[in-house]
Amino acid sequence: MLNKLNLNKLFFIAITLSIFTLEAQESSDESADSMEEVITTARRTEESVSDVPIAISAFSGTDLDEKGITNMEDIRSLVPNMLIQKSAGNQSVAYVSVRGMGSQRGSVQYDNKIAIYVDDAFMIRPQGSLFDLFDVNNLQVLKGPQGTLFGKNTTSGAILVNNNLPVVGEFDSSVKVSMGQRNLNSIAAMVNVPLTSNAALRFVGITKKQDGYINNLDGFADDGGIIDNETFRAMLSVDITEDLNLLYTYSMFDSAGTPVYANCEVYTNSNMLSGGPAINVLTNGMKTRAVESC
């Protein structure tokens, strides 16, 4: 009798565990089906990321918003084997490397090894590549040589940024306000305005300001690391026919912040007069006054 009761208990426990396993599997399947599918243009045509035979990291605009990505520099936290560094001499210049290959040159005479495309427009030089992000449709990072479809400057890969296009026949708007440490203040706004039954305008504006984190001791210049960015984008879309669309885009990014100095320590120089600011002579002959990290 005792053995029979034990067998009944084991049978009941086995059935219960099976039911829980089935419910968990169904819940997991429903969650997978509800995931947002990201469409990529890595092969110059719209495809699902899962169908593209390329090492790619792709994110929708919703993904970027949920992860707090507001600037090109932030995407380094999302993409494996990718490094984005801000130039010490220019707040808007990015040094990008993928799989250990990239460029550490920020001058206008040097080409990148990783191409950046914004709405299919190639950014020729690294200046202005650390722009702010808002109202983005998707962002894609292609790893490995991409010269066949994207031409030169793609030895290590390519970054594709596709913004939301104007929507015909629909008025829409959105505003995002951000505040943070070092007096961070950021306002981003978007307005979509329908003009006619086949034309629409879309405006995006971003302003971002933040105090620097490097104190300048001599008092004759601003602190290092100040962020003062302004972004404006206007897009006009006209559906000429069902198969022909005219898209005009004007984009402006202004970065008036102060650079992060090459060295952030206090230097003393016995050749300087007592009480005078220390001078650090850099390897390229440039000079910077003494600064102190906060």
Q: Where are the regions a protein language model picked out?
A:
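Outer-membrane beta-barrel domain signature, strongest for Gram-negative TonB-dependent receptors
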Residues: 221, 227-294
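Residue-level signature of outer-membrane beta-barrel architecture
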Residues: 42, 120, 143, 179, ...
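Acidic, small-polar-rich N-terminal luminal/periplasmic segments of exported/outer-membrane proteins
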Residues: 31-168
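Short secondary-structure transition/capping segments
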Residues: 96-100, 214-215, 259-260
